[in-house]
Amino acid sequence: MASKAMPRAPPAAPNLQSLKLCSQNDSSLETTSPSKRSALVPGRSAESSKPNSEVVQKEQKSTQHQNESIDLTGSNDPAEVKAEGNLVPKRLADEEKGVVEDGIANGSLKSSSALGKEHGIASASGSARLVGRSETGERGFSSSRCRPSTSSDVSDESACSSISSVTKPHKANDSRWEAIQMIRTRDGILGLSHFKLLKKLGCGDIGSVYLSELNGTKSYFAMKVMDKASLASRKKLLRAQTEKEILQCLDHPFLPTLYTHFETDKFSCLVMEFCPGGDLHTLRQRQRGKYFPEQAVKFYVAEILLAMEYLHMLGIIYRDLKPENVLVREDGHIMLSDFDLSLRCAVSPTLIRSSNPDAEALRKNNQAYCVQPACVEPSCMIQPSCATPTTCFGPRFFSKSKKDRKPKPEVVNQVSPWPELIAEPSDARSMSFVGTHEYLAPEIIKGEGHGSAVDWWTFGIFLYELLFGKTPFKGSGNRATLFNVIGQPLRFPEYPVVSFSARDLIRGLLVKEPQQRLGCKRGATEIKQHPFFEGVNWALIRCASPPEVPRPVEIERPPKQPVSTSEPAAAPSDAAQKSSDSYLEFDFF
């Protein structure tokens, strides 16, 4: 076992004083050249600006090397440190220990525990994440979908940037797009000076997230601010770049929207959607018994499944699913966040038509089935009441009870009459040791290399935790947890009582052999057809009423200084006045 645990140094948070100076200086919009950006990464030479094909070939070779493994037999030398109940390689902790924020050093920032993560996007995870050595090698895996060249500097006007709602049809009617476009039309490129930082929402591994307001509007965003020097010193610049590239390509109801991004001399900033409902981990803690009812779980995991399906279609393996990374929007629907551990790879979507000859005839001759192609199972009857989406979910999400349902024609093996799109990056391979201990797949722990099947393992752990309020393989410590994942069988507690279909789905997802795991071959299509999701109308899932809608968030404004009646108040200096207009100063830790 490891020796006495050492506290893990918190990731460097941007200095608000530095943010203030950047917001006042137009030069903050300057971007680094490719040569300068390459120089920020230790050991990275001008070869970074070579064509992507050469970089990909080199980086693909590096993924063939075995990643650092965890010694499960124990060691006298402390091989890991414990941070908030999780294992972190000592090498990473030592790197992060030396990263100290300037504001803390000079006393300009005070300690505070009042800044929680109850409301926000990309909130700080309550558990540490493991990142292996070969991570920097695998990121070069190219994808055929929207992968900008890494040989040029990334600016706010990148060809793949989220610069208008035209390229994001799912957000076409979002008023925040109009606010962004209005400022851009007036001032050109957006920068840090266009936003007021109101509150710190959380602190992740590579940056801090702030609630921000676009000046002159009532539009609120979540701004992720990353210190480029800190990222370079911890060799995490490539992770930040990967997250930005992924966010640029996303357009899905249950995934984040990147409204704009920009860089200053010191910081890299991503402006995303603000989720006032917090994360599912916080929401689960507020439930009676600290677990969700099965009907609520079905709602959340169905939306997560659609988001994962979309990511796999783009050749993105998420690798970091957990309740802390699932945020709740203001309407109660979810949003998956935090993509810095994701792996990009090649994928070839395949359209497979039904192999059941009776299914096509059934679709032509029977008009009682739902006309929506996205319905996995034709359980929605076409009748006047079905025009109201809530009747397809009953109550408001699931089908009507069996006694009230009209008998439907027999479908052989429940084969869908519609074509199936299979888009599973099954050939992807990575040797990185990344993830959260209780969610790590067996193949990651063994160092055997992993692919997209790890997402379906984490999906099973996620489902288990929402239903039972705990993860299935959690041990007394991190090392015991890893042993349990590899060697212990799956067990279900007696309470709370869940349906057989829920337990059966979890059994299929938590198969230790990845080739036998549910979803390994046909991806989300295979999982959506499981009986646990019977009655879910996938085409109308956004019309369903969420289990819980968060209360409207009151945006706190900076407190006004009281004016003394006995003596005239001193006029604030121009710098102080401009500072108060730019953001609200608050404590960091």
UniProtKB/Swiss-Prot annotation:
Region spans: Disordered: 1-167, 551-589
InterPro entries: Kinase-like_dom_sf (IPR011009), Prot_kinase_dom (IPR000719), Ser/Thr_kinase_AS (IPR008271)
Extent of Basic and acidic residues compositional bias: 91-100
Catalysed reaction equations from the record: L-seryl-[protein] + ATP = O-phospho-L-seryl-[protein] + ADP + H(+); L-threonyl-[protein] + ATP = O-phospho-L-threonyl-[protein] + ADP + H(+)
Feature: compositional bias, Low complexity: 142-165
Superkingdom per UniProt: Eukaryota
Protein EC: 2.7.11.1
Protein kinase domain boundaries: 195-533
List of catalytic residues: D320
PROSITE patterns: PROTEIN_KINASE_DOM, PROTEIN_KINASE_ST
Enzyme class: transferase
Keywords (A to Z) from UniProt: ATP-binding, Kinase, Nucleotide-binding, Serine/threonine-protein kinase, Transferase
One MF annotation (Gene Ontology) recorded for this entry: ATP binding
Function: May play a role in the regulation of metabolism and signal transduction processes.
Family membership noted in the UniProt record: Belongs to the protein kinase superfamily. Ser/Thr protein kinase family.
UniProt protein name: Protein kinase G11A
Taxonomic source organism: Oryza sativa subsp. indica (Rice)
Species classification: Eukaryota, Viridiplantae, Streptophyta, Embryophyta, Tracheophyta
